[in-house]
A protein has these predicted regions:
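Conserved N-proximal alpha/beta basic substrate-recognition cap immediately N-terminal to
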Residues: 1-68, 72, 86-87
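Acidic/polar active-site rim loop that often engages polyanionic ligands
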Residues: 25, 46-52, 82-90, 146-157
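A short linear hydrophobic-aromatic micro-motif
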Residues: 56, 78-81, 110-113, 185-186, ...
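Short, flexible active-site loops
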Residues: 148-159, 200-213
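Active-site "cap" helix and flanking loop/linker of ATP-utilizing ligase/carboxylase catalytic domains
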Residues: 166-187, 192, 203-237
């Protein structure tokens, strides 16, 4: 038996985690937090409800609903299509340049977002323990492979102004607190015209933080363990 449970990736059975919590097991991050993050439509709605800047989006139950919206000229191309669940690292995401690009889309729940002409993609990894102690790693810049849409290079620290860096760190902290997330939270962001829009979040160690193994006094993996055990958080420099 175990007393404390965490997970490697968010695409797991959240109902099973909730049952374990009801049996008295501690799950970090909690099933309540995971339910919000696991579904991209719920995640985006959470951003809106908590005044977190993000791109405009629409939710669709299936491909027919999307096509009806396109026929009614309610979708502006180009745009970004995302599955609401089980998409990550470039999977379940597609740029739609015209209505023709919907032909081979899976018939599933989805969101369609405005395409943001961003200058940089940023990430902040933040840790929070049950006592409420919070620490961020440095804001980093991510460069993606054009074919796989996966992170290929991470630049640390990000080449951004002090003002933008402060905004990025503050938004990551606000999200961690608002989600009541215990453990790591990776916050992906778009930088556009010196303003930040939140793309999405992941409640786990993240590709943008692997450099912390060699570059920081405390790695993201160590920090996750420290946070869920309610230990004092480590030095992130």
């Amino acid at each position: 038996e175990c007393d404390l449970i965490t997970f490697e990736i968010e695409h797991i059975n959240v109902d099973a985690l909730e049952k374990l919590e009801n049996l008295g097991k501690e799950v970090s991050p909690s099933s309540k937090t995971l339910r919000i993050i696991q579904d991209k439509s719920k995640q985006k709605s959470f951003f809106v409800d908590y005044d977190i800047p993000t791109s405009n989006f629409k939710y669709f139950r299936n491909i027919d609903d999307l096509n009806k919206s396109i026929d009614n000229n309610e979708i502006k191309f180009p745009c970004v299509w995302k599955k609401t669940k089980f998409g990550y690292d470039g999977f379940g995401v597609k740029i739609l340049k015209s209505a023709k690009d919907t032909i081979n889309l899976p018939d599933t729940e989805m969101i369609v977002e405005d395409l943001i002409p961003f200058e940089k993609e940023l990430s902040v990894i933040v840790a929070r323990n049950p006592d409420g102690e919070i620490k961020c790693f440095k804001t980093v810049e991510m460069e993606f492979n054009n074919d796989s849409n996966q992170v290929e290079f991470v630049i640390s620290p990000a080449k951004i102004s002090d003002k933008v860096d402060k905004m990025a760190q503050e938004l990551a902290i606000k999200l961690s607190k608002s989600l009541k997330c215990v453990g790591l939270l990776a916050v992906e962001m778009f930088l556009h015209n010196e303003k930040i829009l939140i793309n999405e979040v992941a409640p786990r160690p993240h590709n943008s933080g692997h450099l912390s193994i060699e570059a920081c006094k405390t790695s993201q993996f160590q920090q996750h363990i420290r946070s869920i055990f309610n230990l004092k958080l480590g030095n992130t420099t």
